[in-house]
Amino acid sequence: MTDRDDLRRTVRVAAVQPPAFTGAEEYKNAAQACAFIDEAADAGAEYVVFPEGYPGPYSGPMENGALTRVCQAARARRVWVSAGRLERGPLPETYHITHVLIDDRGEVRARYRRVQPNHPVFNAYLMGGRHHVLPGDELMTVDAPFGRIGLLICSELFVPELSRILMLRGADLLVAPGGGVHGPTHTRVQETWRCVARTRAAENLVYVVVTQNLFAGSHKGRTCIASPEKMLAQRDDPGIAVADLDLARLDAIRSRFYDEQILSPPAREEDVLGCRPGQSHDRRPELYGELVQPQPDAFDYHYERRGLTTWRAEYDKIREGAHDR
């Protein structure tokens, strides 16, 4: 457990939005990632966040040395890094989408396996049933010199229960590296992503970092850094978004209560909080039991326990259910 008196009061975070390479060119991501680490460190960043599956391996060979090179760069520039890759699962042709947290000594501190992959049955369908993305079964927080990091991946940010649990475990910032899609249609959900990032930050009184790969054909990214009070940084094009996270202000927001501002408004404008302070204390867990009850239409993330070939039946069931609604 980190003693908050020993934490740095501020930390500069760099969220990277790279022009990502896939397939036969995926090997190029490693050198590019190291260059981004240099750029971020030169800008004063202490923590660099890459997107889901970046620098890999993700779509190419499962061992390409990318993670080793990123660890070396993290050690050389004395920065923490969130990197992404695909890891082999326990069964043949199974994989985990993994968020790897590296400290400033270049050592891997955590390997978070995405607990809610984006419809693993759909992934199996798209890959002809040859490859299966399996879910992890553990949520993770990691203590760093600048605060406690809650690890997520991509659209898990849209699942409020995950963010709330990480907050209850003491997370100061939630880091959700995103994947990305090909083509211009993704721009339609860019603002939705940023709205969700701000919402998770405000409702949990945490900082939120989102990143995205820009694949060939991508038009706009969704990379952003949000505080409980406002959007601190965002980027549409390739590059880095940088923001300073203030832990002292975060502690002040968490320790105060909303009514204080109503009854006695602060004299200085900069002391007026742009969120609902004390929000994390306003909870009625005795009313939340339905959240953990089995639901008939809930997605079966562990269909592989019934046999990997059952993905077809699971997919058909979901598709038919969607048509019925």
Model-derived features: positions:
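Active-site catalytic loop in hydrolytic enzyme cores
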Residues: 90-177, 181-199, 219, 259
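C-terminal beta-strand edge segments of enzyme domains
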Residues: 131-132, 203-206, 212-325
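Acidic/histidine-rich helix-loop elements
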Residues: 19-28, 124-128
